[in-house]
């Protein structure tokens, strides 16, 4: 985090006892509880010369003394199961098997403050050194931010929208929004000005937080169309010039000093667990984005029980260390990094904004997380990078890695639950694999999670070969994150784990193989879509069950297996229902040169076809795909007799590569369940899918409708030729 002069937060100049400045986050795990909280609260850990007084903490503690917290009763009138109003309330789905009383975000933070006040909460880089913020400092920064929002005119059940990369400011602004009675709303940093306008208008944003001038420019372009917007705060860079109602973070936090603590306390006292505190907007692939309303109970329940199901541990047992880098506007990252972090006293370290362009591995090495979450595409990129390095290694090192991964994969597939490893497996780990994990930053990582999209069998097998087991979670924005979780205790390859305690599932309209639509019920289920009653009624039935639109099956032990989206199910002209994902995965497994494969067959097409992209390197500055093939792709070409090193050398020209792909698809067809599942035509696209190209969403999930529209001419050509 670079120092900014007079704008936003730079490096602190306060008492060094307030904030540990060390080379690596690991050292900050030592001596976390030396001294009392009040002795350390002399200056802010992020602001220059801004005091966090003992009186402020004393006041906060008096507000939330254990007796007051434990005796507090939430107002639980007979409410409906859903609402579309930002100021509405809902009836909570409390299961007798897990009947914990609902509580608010403030109470969750207070309990963390009581147990973990002196533990490191947030870690960030400042002038190439890691700095740390304790939970006590974090709490008071959130309170000051809350008072700043009140001073700027934040109204009850209106939003503070945050448009910026993950940072301490994102975190304590989000918590401060909830404390102030507002609703925190994340906006993807890749959003256009028009997309920002839609979300800010829909959620009635009173304040928008931006991290850079680039993001500020987006808001300035649409401000006149945002009648509820009162102020913008920029927190990483100074504004280009002085503008009315545009504040630096330092100015914003100073505003909070003008609001009495009692004014904030009064708002906190009136908050109820069944009120909205978070809005998560869907990607909008099938229309305008929908605002998913999550209650305080959704957040506190999921942060506790969803994470417990994933074996996340409280800091008094072992402080979890995580790296925050995925977009916080997505529920998976927000619940995992922000809210679960508070629940269990985790240390959250922030990656650089260019994490997904290549710097993530450097942060992982420095931080050495104990648990880590990535969307499948992130894990695939790590896999491809390892494969590239291996291809460039000497013969002996490459053979050693292949041997070690082979014996380890075989052991993990044949005896997945066994702690007793054969000598050869232990030797392989000692000589080779432990060093690979250390180079990746996973030397201390005990839990590696993925979610938000399906993962290929190839990727799972690759990491099993490294002795890295990837645990799946299944959920949606509408389930506040995970409704099913895998963990070291509940793991089955290719499954999405078991139900989170207190949650329910049923499969409706099951076929002969037991596959049906997944319907969910429990404390994770969202309040409703903001201002969209028709969409809410489509999603939630009269008994309160959420219809996910996903198809899946349950095995005898309760493990869930996702088979695809019902909307993505391809219905051929012959009436066959074809789930695309298994076929796409089979093609990528058979052909290691393929980056993306998308099955085509919608609109009652007479046969299946497929669009393919090739694995290529990414531009280090933009993360856009280049024309250069990856080392793995070049190796594939050489194996089949091609000298190609770029995509353009292959598309429409390279007979050797085309023949190899044709043979691979023929092998996939031979293993298909029936002829209607065969891929009859295919094409290689000139450019890999990307976020900038529109084919991938912010979490790198495939946007099928966009692909169908963008490559309509190519797709139509498959079927025009059939008519001739």
UniProtKB/Swiss-Prot annotation:
The keyword Transmembrane helix does not apply. Pfam families: AMP-binding (PF00501), AMP-binding_C_3 (PF23562). SUPFAM superfamilies: Acetyl-CoA synthetase-like. The keyword Nucleotidyltransferase does not apply. Its EC number is 6.2.1.3. Residues 1-51 are annotated as: Disordered. Belongs to the ATP-dependent AMP-binding enzyme family. Bubblegum subfamily. This is Long-chain-fatty-acid--CoA ligase ACSBG1. Residues 20-30 have a biased composition (Basic and acidic residues). GO terms for cellular component: cytoplasmic vesicle; endoplasmic reticulum; plasma membrane. Keywords: ATP-binding, Cell membrane, Cytoplasm, Cytoplasmic vesicle, Endoplasmic reticulum, Fatty acid metabolism, Ligase, Lipid metabolism, Membrane, Microsome, Nucleotide-binding, Phosphoprotein. It is found in: Cytoplasm; Cytoplasmic vesicle; Microsome; Endoplasmic reticulum. The modification Phosphoserine is found at residues 53, 56. Catalyzes the conversion of fatty acids such as long-chain and very long-chain fatty acids to their active form acyl-CoAs for both synthesis of cellular lipids, and degradation via beta-oxidation. Can activate diverse saturated, monosaturated and polyunsaturated fatty acids. One of its GO terms (molecular function) is long-chain fatty acid-CoA ligase activity. Residues 31-51 have a biased composition (Polar residues). The modification Phosphotyrosine is found at residue 658. It catalyses: a long-chain fatty acid + ATP + CoA = a long-chain fatty acyl-CoA + AMP + diphosphate; (E)-hexadec-2-enoate + ATP + CoA = (2E)-hexadecenoyl-CoA + AMP + diphosphate; hexadecanoate + ATP + CoA = hexadecanoyl-CoA + AMP + diphosphate. ATP binds at residues 282-290, 472-477, 550, 565, 701. CDD domains: ACSBG_like.
């Amino acid at each position: 985090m670079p120092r900014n002069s007079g704008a936003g937060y730079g490096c602190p100049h306060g008492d060094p006892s307030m904030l540990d400045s060390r080379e690596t986050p690991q050292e900050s795990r030592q001596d976390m509880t030396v001294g009392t909280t009040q002795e350390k609260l002399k200056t802010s850990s992020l602001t220059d010369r801004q005091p966090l007084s003992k009186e402020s903490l004393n006041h906060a503690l008096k507000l939330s003394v254990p007796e007051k917290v434990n005796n507090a009763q939430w107002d639980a009138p007979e409410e409906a199961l859903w609402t579309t109003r930002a100021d509405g309330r809902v009836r909570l789905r409390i299961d007798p098997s897990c009947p914990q009383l609902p509580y608010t975000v403030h109470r969750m933070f207070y309990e963390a403050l009581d147990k973990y006040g002196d533990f490191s909460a947030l870690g960030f880089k400042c002038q190439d050194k890691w700095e740390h913020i304790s939970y006590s400092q974090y709490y008071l920064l959130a309170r000051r931010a809350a008072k700043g929002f009140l001073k700027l005119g934040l109204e009850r059940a209106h939003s503070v929208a945050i448009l910026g990369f993950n940072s301490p400011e994102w975190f304590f602004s989000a918590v401060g929004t909830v404390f102030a009675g507002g609703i925190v709303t994340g906006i993807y940093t890749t959003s256009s000005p028009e997309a920002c306008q839609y979300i800010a208008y829909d959620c009635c944003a009173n304040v928008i937080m931006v991290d850079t001038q680039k993001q500020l420019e987006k808001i300035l372009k649409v401000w006149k169309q945002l009648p509820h917007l009162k102020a913008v705060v920029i927190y990483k860079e100074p504004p280009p010039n002085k503008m009315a109602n545009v504040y630096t973070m330092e100015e914003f936090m100073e505003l909070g000093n003008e609001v009495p603590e009692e004014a904030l306390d009064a708002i906190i006292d009136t908050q109820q667990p069944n009120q909205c505190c978070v809005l998560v907007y869907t990607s909008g692939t099938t229309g305008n984005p929908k605002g998913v309303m999550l209650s305080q109970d959704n957040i506190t329940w999921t942060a506790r029980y969803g994470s417990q199901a994933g074996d996340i541990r409280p800091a008094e047992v072992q402080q979890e260390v995580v790296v925050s880098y995925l977009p916080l506007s997505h529920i998976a990252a927000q619940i995992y990094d922000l809210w679960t972090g508070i629940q269990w006293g985790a240390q959250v370290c922030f990656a650089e904004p260019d994490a997904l362009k290549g710097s993530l591995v450097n942060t992982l090495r420095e931080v050495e997380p104990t648990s880590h979450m990535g969307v499948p595409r992130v894990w695939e990129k790590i896999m491809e990078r390892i494969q590239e390095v291996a291809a460039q290694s000497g013969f002996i090192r490459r053979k050693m890695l292949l041997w070690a991964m082979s014996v380890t994969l075989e052991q993990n597939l044949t005896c997945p639950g066994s702690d007793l490893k054969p000598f050869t497996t232990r030797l392989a780990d000692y000589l080779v694999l432990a060093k690979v994990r250390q180079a990746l930053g996973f030397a201390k990582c005990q839990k590696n999670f993925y979610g938000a999209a399906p993962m290929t069998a190839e990727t799972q097998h690759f990491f099993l070969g490294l002795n890295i087991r990837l645990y799946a979670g299944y959920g949606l924005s509408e389930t506040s994150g995970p409704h099913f979780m895998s963990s070291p205790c509940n793991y089955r390859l290719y499954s999405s784990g078991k139900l989170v305690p207190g949650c329910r599932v049923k499969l409706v309209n099951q076929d002969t193989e037991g596959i049906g639509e997944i319907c969910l019920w429990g404390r994770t289920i969202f309040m409703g879509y903001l201002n969209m009653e028709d969409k809410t009624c489509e999603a939630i039935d009269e008994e309160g069950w959420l219809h996910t639109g996903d198809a899946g099956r349950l095995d005898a032990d309760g493990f869930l297996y996702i088979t695809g989206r019902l909307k993505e199910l391809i219905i051929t002209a012959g009436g066959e229902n074809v789930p695309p994902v298994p076929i796409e995965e089979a093609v990528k497994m058979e052909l290691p040169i393929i980056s993306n494969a998308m099955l085509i067959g919608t609109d009652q097409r007479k046969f299946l076809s497929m669009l393919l992209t090739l694995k290529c390197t990414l531009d280090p500055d933009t993360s856009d795909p280049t024309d250069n093939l990856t080392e793995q792709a070049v190796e594939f070409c050489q194996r089949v007799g091609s000298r190609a090193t770029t995509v353009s050398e292959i598309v429409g020209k390279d007979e050797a590569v085309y023949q190899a792909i044709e043979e691979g698809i023929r092998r996939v067809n031979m293993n298909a369940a029936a002829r209607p599942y065969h891929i009859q035509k295919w094409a290689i696209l000139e450019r890999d899918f990307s976020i900038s190209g529109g084919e991938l969403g912010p979490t790198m999930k495939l946007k099928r409708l966009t692909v169908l529209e963008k490559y309509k001419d190519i797709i139509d050509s498959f079927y025009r030729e059939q008519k001739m």
